[in-house]
Every structure is written in C-alpha cells, then in structure tokens.
Amino acid sequence: MTLRIVTPGSNTSLIQPGFSLLHFSSHVFYLGQKGWPKRSCPTGVFLLDLKNNDLKLRPATFTNDSCYLPPLRHPAVCSFSASQGGEITQYLIHGGKTPNNEISHKLYIMTMAFPVNKRFSLCCSEKDLAGDVPEARYGHSMNVVFSRGKNAVVMFGGRSYMPLNQRTTENWNNVIDCEPLVYLIDLQFGCSTSFNLRELQDGLSFHVSLARNDTVYIFGGHSLGNNFRPPNVYKIKVDLPLGSPAVSCTVINSKISFSSSIVTQTSPDEFVIVGGYESDSQKRLICNGVFLDDETIDIQEIETPDWTGEIKHSKTWFGADMGKGAVLFGIPVDNKHQSTDCSFFFYVLNFGDNDPALQTCSQGSTEEQEDSMPLEDSEEFTFNRDGNIFDEDTYNEDDEDDESVTGYWIKCCPDCDMDRNTWEPFYSTELNKPSMIFCSKDGGHWVHSQCMDLSETMLKYLSQNNIKYFCNEHVEVARGVQTPEKTPPVKKTSLKSVRKRTTINRLSAVKKSFLRRLFE
C-alpha cells in the first residue's frame, strides 16, 4: 500500500467533487468537469494522464455517431462486460447533476472504439427505457448481475428534487430521498421494473455497492429524511428465470456506518472501502477490506495508510476509483497555499501490486504530445472518427469561466443580495434560476432583472423587441455618450418687422377735389 501526492498539470482545475472515472483496460477517462465544456474540448471527457507523479487531463475524442454527454456530478456508474468476469467493454451512466444543478434522468452507454492512428476514441449512446422508468436522481448506485445465463442492471437509492405538485417558493431547491425501490433494467429490451421490498424502508444515497454473480451488496449511505447512516449491509439477490424476475433482500448488521466512501477492487473476490464520512463533520480515516464468496461476506478493518497532516486536518475530501486497487482523491487547498493555480491537492492511494502511474497512459506517444502543434482559433472542432482533430495540449484553462463570476448567483450590483439558498422565484418565467438581462455598456455584463426593479411587463417588452438595455449604474453614462438629436432652429420674429409702419394709401389731387365737391 502506497500513498503519494501528485503534481497537478494541465486542465486539473476542471476537477471537482462528484467526478467519475471510467477505466478501459489501461486507459482511465475523467467525467464530470467543472462548468460546461468549452470550444477547446466540446466533449467534456478527458483522458487521465499520470506519469512521473504529474497529473494531466487530455481531451478525449468521440466517434461521429456519438450523442452528447453533459458533465455530470454524482451519477451512478457501473462497468459492463459481455460475460461474467470478462473484460470491461461498456460503462453505464445514469442520472447526476449538470453544471446548472439540473438532475438528469437519462441512461448513457459508453464504449471504447477501435484505436486509429495510435489514439482511442469513445462512443456514447443514449438508452431509452420503458416501464417503471427511474426518476431523475443523483448519489445512487448501479450494478450488473448475472443469473441463469442472463444479465440485468440493479439500480437503487439516490436523491432528487421534490415533486412539482409539492414544490413551493420556499422549498424549490430542496432535495429529498428517492423512494426505496429496487429497479431491475433489461438492457437488451430497454425494460425497467421496480420492486418494493419490505426490508428497505428508508431512502438511501451516497452508499457503496458491490456485485457478485446474482447478488448486490449495499453498504453504508446516508438517509436524508432522518439524517442517519445505517450500520447495515443490504444483500439483494436477483433471480432471472424465463418468466418474471424475482428480487429478495436480506439485512446484515455490519456495525460500520459511513457515506460517500470509495470502493476499489484488488482481486476478483476482494475489495477495499476507503474515505467517506462517519458524520456530517467527521471524516472516516480507517479502511475496510471486503471479502466475498458465493454465499457469505466478511468485512474486516485493514491497515490504515499513513495519512499526511493536510489530509487529517482537512474537513472534506473526495475521489474516485482508478481501477486495479488505486484511488485518486483530492482535498481543498488551505489559505497558506492559495497562490497555487489548482484549488485542490491530489493524492493517489494504491492498494494493488501495480503502479497506477504505469497503468495510465495518454493517447499517442510522449513525443507526439510534445511536438504536436496547437490548433488555430479559426479551426472548427468536430466529433471525428479518426481521432486526429483534437490535440491533447490545446485545451486552454483560461477559457474556462469561473462559475462564481459568470453564474446565476453573481453579485451583479452593490445592492445585489441573490443567494442560492434563500432565493425564491419572482417572475412567472423563473423556475430554478433567477432571471437575468444583459447590460450593453462597453463589453457588456449580466445583471439580475429583480435587482434592476424591472417589472415583468417591461422585461417581456425588452426581450420581445430586442431593445438594448443599460443597468441602473450605467444608464446615466449611456445617456451622456449618446449623440444629441438634431433640433430645428428656433424661428425668431425680426424686430424690423415689428417696428414697420402700416402702409398709408395717399389720395390723388383729382380724387380729393371730387370728394370735396361731393360733400359740399
């Protein structure tokens, strides 16, 4: 058993809690980046490159027929092989949270395409389900079981938002435990069936699950409803006859309780549980070995790694299984090390015999990576079957927006008091994010419509008529730089015309003499 710190390299700033690792043979892929994918790597999936204690993430390539896979935090991930104990050929990915905190309900299947030009490509497809379709959730588990020559996927646990008919402005963003149902999914026909077992009374999430033959073992986890970590092992046995499947559950008292732990496999029948939490404020620093056979399970405490001072004093930690007995986990950087580019320290804990640095390699040789030329900004990035369009070192971390600055919960003005935990919908068009409007001052910036005291009528008028908007701080500046309108000159009455005398018609001498004689 070895524990060593690794040096963060390119793109490691995209690593965040809730990520997942997919290991195909000797290749490990990272899923669940921070924020939405950028143009430099639109796939959002990276190859984990660990050499000489340097950790790097290199953009992965997908085939042309792949569907889009969003970055997902805390999804249920499980490997799938065509035969029991065979080589991993597929990964199943269900649920998880997107960067917008929306919870996914989709099921994806990830496979490794044949290598072309010494590079590996991935293929992602979406699987439609029918029957008792599981609701959108995260923090749950999936496992593949084999029975009577057939296989099925067992899904259990997780959290989700409250049903729409129960959500109000006060609890709009609150999550609850999903119902303690066991879902049995037939991948061949896309059918899903739910089972309500009396041994499972409370919802459970962030637990550990292991599968052997036709049995799934569920350890630990956290029940949000009663804030409880049960010290039980739930043994779920699946029978797949020609007719309807049968599912049963047995409760075993293990006397250990934890949540958010990581499990890694060291041999076909041996596993190690490491990390996690014993309570909301207490990390779990001990390790347990799990030994499985056909009918029994044995859990023992094993040797604990020599944790560093940073790990012991850190309040939080997170990680994922790298495969073959290795675990990658990180802890937040304290205030003394804020000068570093990365927000986390990363460690590799290895319970196996092989060095994970030798297991994980990058796409292509080291010489190809160092000598490769970066793509120009004008070039378009596409999904390519040949795997030549992406260069591993072209991802620019500066392109990654800081969610604290560009998200919906920014401080848009001095009087802004938007808080993710206390915000309530104000406009009829809002759902789970506040409405924002773009201010056109200089380069432009986003502000909250509610902070600008905009009425819903005015907000609709501005958006429908495509009118430039200036926020309260910049509206006076915007008026000052506007070109003055041309006004016609004021028409002034001439003083000469005012003083002009009226015209007097003078009579001729003939008319005067005629009028004189007439009146005489």
Swiss-Prot record:
The signal sequence is none
Q: Name one GO biological process term.
A: B cell differentiation
**Compartments reported by the entry:** Nucleus
Tissue specificity, in the record's words, reads: Expressed within the thymus, liver and spleen in juvenile frogs, and within the thymus and bone marrow of adults. A lower level expression is seen in the ovaries.
GO terms assigned for molecular function: chromatin binding; histone H3K4me3 reader activity; phosphatidylinositol binding; phosphatidylinositol-3,4,5-trisphosphate binding; phosphatidylinositol-3,4-bisphosphate binding; phosphatidylinositol-3,5-bisphosphate binding; phosphatidylinositol-4,5-bisphosphate binding; sequence-specific DNA binding
Task: Supply the CDD domains for this chain.
Answer: PHD_RAG2
Any domain commentary? The atypical PHD-type zinc finger recognizes and binds histone H3 trimethylated on 'Lys-4' (H3K4me3). The atypical PHD-type zinc finger also binds various phosphoinositides.
User: What this chain does, per the record?
Assistant: Core component of the RAG complex, a multiprotein complex that mediates the DNA cleavage phase during V(D)J recombination. V(D)J recombination assembles a diverse repertoire of immunoglobulin and T-cell receptor genes in developing B and T lymphocytes through rearrangement of different V (variable), in some cases D (diversity), and J (joining) gene segments.
Report the protein name in the record.
Answer: V(D)J recombination-activating protein 2
Organism listed in the record:
Xenopus laevis
